[in-house]
């Protein structure tokens, strides 16, 4: 199965991504597509929720995953795409135009959910090595630059131990440019029940929240 990890370097500077590019360049087989992401945080305005029910909901859109949006709440997730089938259009359930799920939250459910924050990375770079696909992007919020994010993907059917070894190689490269303080997450949202895109979104939330 495919495995992923996400690293967020909050103490990076806007030029750290160039340093990382330089240290990684000797291992790169190809530079692939540009990519972007946006993570939105929503808070429920409903009072008297059960203690076990969190008031926070996350929405992550990834351009390099067919512009799909993953919505996470209470260790559960749904994935919504931007493709409407002919059947949905013909029966009036869809206009045929894409509408991200977070637009529904802000336009039709705004009395329940209020957007609190938006964190995004635009025009990131994708690197392919012999072992991994690594995506790097500077991260911004409304207050300005937040840090550097790395999305690490292994498409080979390797063991968890082998994936850890490959991630360790990336961490060693970060150490070479004096980056040792960062958040790393490679967890499954529900341990033992891997769901690729939901787990990846969960990793984004854990390092960026």
UniProtKB/Swiss-Prot annotation:
Q: Where in the cell is it found?
A: Nucleus
Q: Which GO terms describe its molecular function?
A: protein domain specific binding; TFIID-class transcription factor complex binding; transcription coactivator activity
Q: An example Gene Ontology cellular component term from the record?
A: core mediator complex
Tell me which InterPro entries the record gives. Med20 (IPR016532), Mediator_Med20 (IPR013921)
Keyword Phosphoprotein assigned to the entry: answer is: no
Pfam hit, one = Med20
Give the record's subunit note. Answer: Component of the Mediator complex.
Q: Which family does it belong to?
A: Belongs to the Mediator complex subunit 20 family.
PANTHER family associated with the record: MEDIATOR OF RNA POLYMERASE II TRANSCRIPTION SUBUNIT 20, UBIQUITIN SPECIFIC PROTEASE HOMOLOG 49
* Name of this protein: Mediator of RNA polymerase II transcription subunit 20
Q: Which organism is it from?
A: Eremothecium gossypii (strain ATCC 10895 / CBS 109.51 / FGSC 9923 / NRRL Y-1056) (Yeast)
What's the encoding gene here?
SRB2
């Amino acid at each position: 199965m495919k495995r992923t990890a996400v690293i967020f370097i909050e103490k990076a500077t806007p030029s750290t991504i160039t340093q990382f590019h330089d240290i990684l360049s000797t291992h790169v087989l190809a530079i692939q597509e540009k990519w972007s992401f946006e993570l939105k945080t929503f808070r429920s305005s409903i009072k008297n929720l059960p203690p076990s029910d969190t008031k926070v909901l996350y929405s992550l859109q990834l351009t390099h995953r067919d512009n799909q949006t993953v919505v996470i709440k209470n260790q559960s997730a749904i994935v919504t795409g931007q493709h409407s089938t002919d059947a949905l259009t013909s029966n009036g359930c869809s206009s045929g135009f894409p509408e991200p799920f977070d637009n529904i939250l802000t336009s039709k459910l705004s009395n329940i959910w209020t957007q609190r924050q938006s964190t995004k990375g635009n025009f990131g770079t994708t690197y392919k090595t012999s072992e991994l696909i690594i995506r790097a992007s500077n991260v911004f919020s409304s207050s300005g630059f937040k840090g550097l994010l790395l999305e690490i993907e292994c498409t080979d059917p390797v063991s968890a131990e082998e994936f850890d070894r490959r991630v360790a190689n990336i961490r060693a490269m970060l150490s070479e440019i004096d980056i040792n303080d960062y958040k790393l997450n490679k967890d499954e949202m529900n341990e033992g029940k891997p769901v690729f895109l939901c787990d990846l979104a969960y990793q984004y939330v854990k390092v960026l929240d």
